[in-house]
Amino acid sequence: VLRPSQMCNLSEVVVRSDDDINSLKRKIRLATILGTMQATLTNFHYLRDIWKQNAEEEALLGVSLTGVMDNKLLSGQEGKSKLNDALEQLKAYAIETNKTWAKKLGINQATAVTTIKPSGTVSQLVDCASGMHPRWSQYYIRTVRGSINDPVAKMMMERGFPWEPSVMKPDVEVVFSFPVKAPDNCITVDRISAIEQLELWKAYKEH
């Protein structure tokens, strides 16, 4: 939990369907190094001193996984014990990497290293399931809002991208629609129950 006058320091691991424990460790290492380097950037010119003090004391990281449901190991499809073991290994590896690099950089070791966040925007940019959630369906329409005065939005309208005025702000905003096909054999919301999703959340919370 963040203190008052404290900010996140997030870095993201994109999980792919073919990732195994070794490739995940490599990604975790790089994301942790990046986060630890970001934790050195505490010269906040326009904020009160308490922001700098909190950032330096806790040196927080937020190494997150997105695309969990695209991977058999991390989605629990290979069994609960394998998932729990993998999460413990990855967490320990992130903590050890942070410890090593914090010492090299002359900063405090992070008081928190790992997290899981929804990652809605990142998942769209890299085409993966969002955070620890399944994809919606095999085929669906993704909508994206844009300002009617934005040059990119204007170009898209001129080039024939499907669009319509926004219901909420029809004079200033448009909504573009994109057809999306999810990867074959991915987990979609109709293939996992609410209880199974909560069990997965619990595993990530505990490990």
Q: What is each residue range found by the language model?
A:
Residues T42-D49, G67, K72-P118:
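Internal maturation/activation junctions in enzymes
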